[in-house]
Every structure is written in C-alpha cells, then in structure tokens.
C-alpha cells in the first residue's frame, strides 16, 4: 500500500479504509487478524451490509464497533447548505427557553425546511443542490439512486416472483403513506398476499436500509415491543427527498417551494418526522 500510494505508513496512526466490503465479505473475517497484529487502524464501509454480510464465515465479535450512517436530518442539511452555526444555536436557544424565534430567521428556516423536503438528506442529492442550485438536477440524482435500489432488489433472490413483490412494495410506499387507513395493505398488491408469507421480503427492505417499517402496538405502554403487532405497520421511505421524487409526476417540488395548499403535506411531514426519529 505504501509503495502504491507513495505515502509512508505510520504505525498506530495510519488509517486503512476498506470501501465496498460487500464485494469481498471475507474482509470481515480477515480484519480480526489485522487488528490482532496491531500496526494500523482499520475502517470498513459499504452498502447493503445488513443483507450482504449475513453469511460471512466468522464475525469478528469484539474486534470492531459498528456505526450506522443515515441520510442527513434537517439540522445537518441546513449546515451543509451554509447556515452559520450561530443561527442554529439561536434557534436551539429559543426552543429551550420557549421564546419566539427572530421573524427573519423563522422565515428563512421555514424556506429551508421546504427545500429539505424536496432535496432530502442523501449526500449525493445534497451535494448536487449545493453545486448546481438546480432542483431538476437534484431530481435526476434522486432518480438515479432509486434506479440503483431497484437493481439491488433485482439481485435479491433467484425467485423472480419475490423480486417482483419487493419491487412492487417499494413502488407502493408513496401511495400507501397517503392511504386513509394509516397502514400498509398487502392486498393492494395481490388478493392472496399475506404478511406471514412475505415477511422476509419486508425485512429485506428494512435490512437494506431502503425502507423504515413502523409497527402498530396494542397499547402505548412501555416496553412497546411487548404489544407490537407485526402484521399491522406503516412503511416509510428511507429518505424524504426520495419520497418527494417518487411523487414528482405532479410537479410536487415546485408546489412545495411555492407553498401551494393543494399538496398533501401530511404524509410528507409524517415521513420527515419518522426519518428524524430513526436517525
């Protein structure tokens, strides 16, 4: 590595970064020996790790700590687009002291919130907006991400029917969030479809970080897990910007920026909150 990069490696200080480790799952096993040897610091990253690394030969328990990366939340987004830290601190102070936010700051933050609903928190989409200040370019980037998701779904299983079910479930998320019954209805895909038969397909979408399931509970008493009803749930996209992109056939981005009232903001706002809580 040192010869290739022409950079000297310093014991205990050099960080060696392995990216896209899902393409070589054995790295997860080998890293144990590398850590034991002790010369360098190692970081591993990749995509779809929740599903791609389930069958690795030996999990290096005790040799690594795991960090989950999520799409940017609203605070991270406004920092990325250039809002000074002192402005964010002023908003936080008003919140904690229960005092009104300066009117000008309030107006600008609301405009940025509308922008966040459109751009979302996917790093590539945010960077595209920063570089171009063009929503159409952002939508193109988001569509590319969604298309990559669909390609990953196509790799899921040899069973073509399972691939089609997952693809259809993913496409149905936007309309299901608008449904009056407030939960995902499997029969909209197929009259004979049951959660028990296809639970693993929903779990795959969750483990692949493409969707966020939120389960109903019989009563709002802690711990919620004890009264969880796994067959009654809502399914959110993993990013509000991707959700807006899936809604984009009606020109929702422009309507949101213009503050139009003929937009169903309920599902979009609900999704934004779900995404923030998950992160």
Q: Which residue ranges define each predicted feature?
A:
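Conserved NTP-binding/hydrolysis module of P-loop NTPases
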Residues: 1-8
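Conserved P-loop NTPase "ATPase switch" module shared by AAA+ and STAND
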Residues: 8-27
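Structural recognition of the conserved hydrophobic beta-strand(s) that form the central parallel beta-sheet
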Residues: 17-19, 41-47, 68, 77
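A short acidic, amphipathic alpha-helical/loop segment
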Residues: 29-33
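Sensor-1/coupling segment of RecA-like P-loop NTPase cores
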Residues: 36-57
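Interdomain motor-coupling "hinge/lid" segment immediately C-terminal to the ATP-binding subdomain
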Residues: 53-178
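Accessory nucleic acid-recognition modules appended to NTPase machines
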Residues: 127, 131-279
């Amino acid at each position: 590595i040192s010869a290739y990069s022409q950079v000297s490696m310093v014991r205990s200080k050099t960080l060696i970064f392995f990216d896209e480790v899902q393409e070589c799952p054995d790295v997860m096993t080998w890293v144990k020996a590398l850590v034991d040897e002790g010369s360098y610091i190692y970081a591993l990253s990749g995509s779809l790790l929740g599903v791609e690394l389930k069958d690795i030969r030996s999990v290096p328990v005790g040799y690594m700590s795991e960090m989950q990366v999520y799409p940017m939340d609203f605070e991270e987004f406004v920092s990325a687009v250039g809002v000074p830290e002192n402005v964010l601190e002023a908003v936080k102070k008003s919140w904690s002291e229960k005092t009104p936010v300066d009117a000008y700051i309030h107006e600008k933050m609301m405009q940025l919130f509308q922008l966040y609903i459109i751009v979302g928190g996917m790093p590539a989409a945010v960077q595209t907006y920063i570089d171009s200040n063009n929503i159409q370019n952002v939508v193109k980037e988001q569509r590319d991400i969604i298309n990559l998701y669909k390609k990953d779904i196509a790799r899921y299983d040899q069973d073509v029917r399972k691939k089609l079910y997952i693809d259809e479930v993913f496409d149905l998320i936007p309309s299901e969030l608008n449904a009056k019954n407030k939960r995902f209805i499997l029969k909209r895909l197929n009259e004979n479809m049951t959660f028990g038969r296809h639970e693993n397909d929903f779990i795959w979408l969750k483990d692949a970080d493409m969707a966020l399931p939120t389960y109903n509970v019989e009563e709002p008493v802690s711990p919620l897990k004890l009264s969880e009803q796994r067959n009654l749930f809502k399914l959110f996209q993993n990013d509000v910007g991707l959700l807006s992109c899936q809604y984009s056939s009606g020109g929702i981005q422009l309507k949101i920026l213009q503050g139009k009232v003929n937009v169903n903001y309920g599902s979009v706002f609900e999704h934004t909150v779900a995404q923030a809580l998950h992160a």
